[in-house]
A protein has these predicted regions:
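Generic beta-strand/beta-sheet core signal
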Residues: 6, 202-204, 238-240, 266-268, ...
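Conserved SAM/AdoMet-binding glycine-rich loop
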Residues: 75-77, 84, 193-319, 327
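Terminal RNA-binding accessory module
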Residues: 349-446
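Short glycine-enriched, charge-decorated loop/helix-capping segments at active-site entrances
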Residues: 47-48, 173-174, 213-216, 276-282, ...
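Conserved beta-strand core positions
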Residues: 3, 40-41, 152, 199, ...
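Conserved, mostly hydrophobic/aromatic
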Residues: 164, 184, 201, 237, ...
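Extended hydrophobic-aromatic, low-complexity segments
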Residues: 261-262, 275-276, 287, 299-302, ...
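Proteins enriched for Cys/Gly/acidic motifs involved in redox and nucleic-acid/cofactor modification
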Residues: 1-209, 248, 259, 263, ...
Length: 446
């Protein structure tokens, strides 16, 4: 069968998509990019915030229209939206032939067989394919990498135990479950054997890896084992909760040359009052202490964070506290979301909800401040010599685009490398920074 696969949402969802693609390829199916050529369309959805939910629904409705042309035989919906709104999707969008939960994606080949069956009973059996939300699928480690082949994500855990008051993730992804280390090492080896040079560790919270399986945090041990895999040049860590960062983890990052001096710290806010309302397990003082320790121990570390502005009850004074914190900390990378009320979360029913226009004003103020910080940092980089991973060629120019260790794919900046030499995606090149443009750098090949 010709299958069109649409993957929405975060990098963790993308890993699930790649696992499903690997299963389908092994089962003999062909992947296509054109919906008019597809016999089956699979949509892996997201519902983390309102905009993500709307994007998922719009994609489902657009693909449902394809069934009217006659070629499309089946439409399958999986992922977080499917887990959260399974009954509503079945009832309100009859064009959807099957709904798979977040822990059922390993059943994708069986579900396709079912929806294409001539038997009404078999079609009915797979219409709603759900396993316990705390089940941990551990499948064949041969994924179909969709990120270009030179970098890939490694999902080291599923679910979350934090239960922040604004977040729906524990309801749709279950409690925190670590993937066994031996499985991760096998998967990483397969990725390296396939040409992957940068491995990016993801989970809802990477810093808690191992606590459920081994009774202790095992991220440092996992990192040391991954560093022994030949072929890997960079290992990057995302989604590190600041309060869970240990001295042992910092030491591993310092000692292992393959580990990028880069951490993603999703702090969300810096006012103690808002942190408490969010259900976060840290304070402004603790955040400052952790950030200062990281910079003291690893002076060239790049720190990325994400913030939520306009949380229920956020006063102008608390917003200014956050502005002051951002100004003081000078993060290398920063993203700001406006608070999105999600049904079935405590924050959605909290008093003092903030008007949308106020949220957007505060978001703009934070991003304007961060822009000034990043522009100053970029100017300071001019003259530096950096190792760059090449992502691809700039069309019709003697230039390439790449990333430094300070830049995670899709969320951070880029560096444009001027050269007439022939380079390939995944190549590493030494580049001298000669200029800056907004969030990006410009350089020349050395």
């Amino acid at each position: 069968m010709n299958i069109l696969f649409i993957s929405l949402g975060c990098d963790k969802n993308l890993v699930d998509s790649e696992v499903m693609l690997g299963i389908l390829a092994k089962d003999g199916h062909q992947m296509v990019d054109d919906e008019t050529m597809a016999d089956v369309i699979i949509i892996n959805t997201c519902c983390f915030i309102h905009d993500a939910k709307e994007e998922s629904i719009q994609n489902i409705l657009e693909m449902a229209d394809m069934k009217k042309t006659g070629r499309l035989k089946a439409l399958i919906v999986t992922g977080c939206l499917a887990q959260r709104y399974k009954e509503e999707i079945i009832q309100e969008i009859p064009e959807v032939d099957a709904v798979l939960g977040t822990t059922s994606y390993e059943e994708i080949a069986h579900v396709i067989d079912g929806v294409l069956s001539d038997s009404p009973m078999e079609r009915g059996d797979v219409r709603l394919t759900m396993k316990d939300v705390d089940y941990l699928p551990v499948t064949d480690t041969h994924r179909m990498v969709t990120t270009g082949g030179h970098f890939a994500y490694l999902k080291i855990a599923e679910g979350c135990d934090k239960h922040c008051t604004y977040c729906i993730i524990p309801k749709v992804r279950g409690d925190f479950r670590s993937v066994p280390m031996e499985h991760l090492l096998e998967e990483a080896q397969n990725l390296a054997d396939g040409g992957v040079k940068e491995l990016i560790l993801v989970a809802q919270e990477t810093t808690m890896y191992g606590t459920d399986l081994y009774g202790e945090k095992r991220l440092p041990q996992l990192l040391r084992a991954l560093c022994k895999i030949s072929g890997l040049r960079w290992i990057r860590i995302l989604y590190c909760y600041p309060e869970e960062i240990t001295d042992e983890l910092i030491q591993v990052i310092k000692e292992e040359p393959k580990i990028c001096h880069y951490l993603d710290l999703p702090i969300q806010h810096a006012s103690d009052g808002i942190l408490k309302r969010m259900g976060r397990r840290t304070s402004r003082a603790q955040l400052i202490e952790t950030i200062e320790k990281l910079r003291r121990e690893i002076p060239d570390i790049a720190l990325r964070t994400t913030l939520i502005t306009g949380f229920p009850g956020e006063t102008q004074e608390q917003h200014e506290e956050l502005m002051d914190f951002v100004d003081q900390m000078e993060f290398d990378r920063l993203g700001v979301f406006t608070y999105s009320p999600e049904e079935d979360t405590p924050a959605a029913s909290m008093p003092d909800q903030i008007p949308e226009e106020v949220k957007e004003e505060r978001q703009a103020e934070l991003m304007e401040l961060q822009q000034d910080i990043v522009f100053d940092q970029a100017e300071d980089r001019i003259g530096e010599e950096l190792l760059v991973m090449i992502e691809g060629k700039v069309a019709d120019e003697n230039a390439y685009v790449g990333r430094t260790y300070r830049d995670a794919p899709n969320v951070d900046g880029l560096i444009f490398v001027n050269t007439s030499e022939e380079l390939m995606s995944g190549d590493f090149a030494k580049v001298k920074v000669t200029g800056a443009a907004d969030y990006d750098l410009i350089g020349e090949l050395l």
